[in-house]
Amino acid sequence: MITVLRLDHRLGRDTRITTHVCLTARAFGADKVILSGEHDKHIIESAQKVVENWGGDFEVEYQKAYRPVIKEHKQKGFEIIHLTMYGKHVEDVVPTIRDNNRDKLIIVGGSRVPTDVYEAADWNLSVTNQPHSEVAALAICLHYMMDGSELKTVYDDGKMQIVPNNEHKEVIKNE
């Protein structure tokens, strides 16, 4: 199981980026996103609508405080992975992480990540040591963790399904 924890969501200010964290997590193979910070029912509803329309078992839930989420997952044996530009290079350590068969909690930062998150993590991973989008970091990390298999995932239980086509858009609508 791969769960993504989005730290300190802020209403209005973070809506678009947090929505993209959820969409990216789902598309790249995560099972769940937990949002911390300010409650935003619209993001949760939006993610549920994507699952309803496009399929899969993905879910989004809200927990105001992130510390209990990290503690609970650590107690359950999850490997805690924090995405940060200050960490070890993702490509150097993901094979070790991928191959140990533990459930994963991937932490994606918000405005400013407190020191205790770095300390709680089993791994502080970077996708480059340069500032960039947490969405890009999550996508690349999940891509490495899934060993590329997520790129061909097909969900048969959605209302819609894209048929890859080089010449035009093709969408099958399932009743």
From Swiss-Prot:
Subcellular location: Cytoplasm
MF terms in GO: tRNA (cytidine(56)-2'-O)-methyltransferase activity
InterPro entries: Alpha/beta_knot_MTases, tRNA_m1G_MTases_N, tRNA_mtfrase_aTrm56
Major site of localization recorded for this protein: cytoplasm
Domain of life assignment: Archaea
Single GO biological process annotation from the record: tRNA nucleoside ribose methylation
Assigned keywords, A-Z: Cytoplasm, Methyltransferase, S-adenosyl-L-methionine, Transferase, tRNA processing
Catalysed reaction equations from the record: cytidine(56) in tRNA + S-adenosyl-L-methionine = 2'-O-methylcytidine(56) in tRNA + S-adenosyl-L-homocysteine + H(+)
Subunit structure, interactors included: Homodimer.
Family to which this protein belongs: Belongs to the aTrm56 family.
HAMAP family, sorted: tRNA_methyltr_aTrm56 (MF_00077)
Described purpose of this protein according to its UniProt entry: Specifically catalyzes the AdoMet-dependent 2'-O-ribose methylation of cytidine at position 56 in tRNAs.
Name this polypeptide is given: tRNA (cytidine(56)-2'-O)-methyltransferase
Organism annotation: Methanosphaera stadtmanae (strain ATCC 43021 / DSM 3091 / JCM 11832 / MCB-3)
